[in-house]
Design a protein with these regions (language model features):
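C-terminal amphipathic alpha-helical interaction region
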Residues: 155-239
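Long, charge-rich C-terminal accessory regions
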Residues: 53-187
Length: 239
């Protein structure tokens, strides 16, 4: 039983441990758990729906704009705690709990691995699907083509999508443009089917902010470094 209520929504995949009437938060510790990664890989296999026309649009990706956005916020929270209290502090106060220095450092590391893995997955998929002969052609292939993807994302009963796409659909329902259940289901299916194009648009902007350079201007060395970071993250999370 926890002696105080902790809101760890800005520190996703965390453990909460009680020691001597104090709640200790271990940010991102669940990302390093083998069970978390393995369970995520098993989710699609556990889907027993036999009908090819599945009414529920479920996205099984553990790492998505929805979860990575939370991790990026978690990185900001942890770095701000370091800045305010100093990197040499033994413990950091967060809400009504405590974060040990070692847990904070590990949290930054685990979030970093997951963020690199997600961005690397998106980038490598793009590289594999790009029929390009020059760096300039590759940069052009990186330009997002989808209308949606920017901003916040939402999880709607298992469907992960840009909030704007869902809001626009709700507006269409209110206007009467979408007036029956079948049409509504088709709209949800359309949004679900465009997930990876929406994801890429979000990832491009997020990568620019996180790594400090634009893919539209990326050098071969920049891309090589991102692939290396991805490889390191995959190995580190699977240890």
């Amino acid at each position: 039983i926890h002696v105080s209520h902790q809101d760890t929504s800005d520190l996703p995949f965390s453990y909460l441990i009680e020691q001597q009437s104090t709640s200790y938060i271990m940010p991102g510790a669940n990302l390093k758990s083998v069970g978390t990664i393995r369970d995520a890989k098993k989710w699609p296999q556990r889907d027993r729906r036999a009908d090819p026309d599945k009414l529920d649009s479920i996205n099984y990706n553990l790492l998505s704009p929805y979860t990575i956005h939370k991790m990026l916020k978690g990185v900001s929270v942890l770095k701000e705690l370091q800045r305010v209290s100093g990197e040499t502090s033994d413990t950091y106060s967060y809400q009504s709990g405590k974060i040990k220095s070692s847990s904070l450092v590990n949290g930054l590391k685990y979030y970093g691995y997951a963020i690199d893995k997600f961005f690397g997955n998106s980038l490598i998929t793009r590289l594999m699907n790009a029929d390009c002969r020059t760096l300039e052609e590759l940069r052009e292939a990186f330009v997002p083509k989808s209308a949606y993807g920017d901003g916040d994302w939402v999880d709607i009963a298992g469907m992960i999508a840009p909030k704007k796409a869902v809001s626009d659909l709700l507006d269409a329902v209110e206007r009467g443009d979408v007036s029956d259940v079948d049409s509504l289901n088709r709209c949800f299916e359309d949004i679900h089917s465009e997930y990876y194009s929406y994801e890429w648009r979000w990832a491009c902007k997020a990568m620019e902010e996180y790594y400090g350079f634009s893919l539209a201007e990326a050098s071969v060395d920049d891309l090589s470094e991102l692939v290396q970071r991805w490889r390191n993250s995959v190995v580190s999370l699977d240890k």
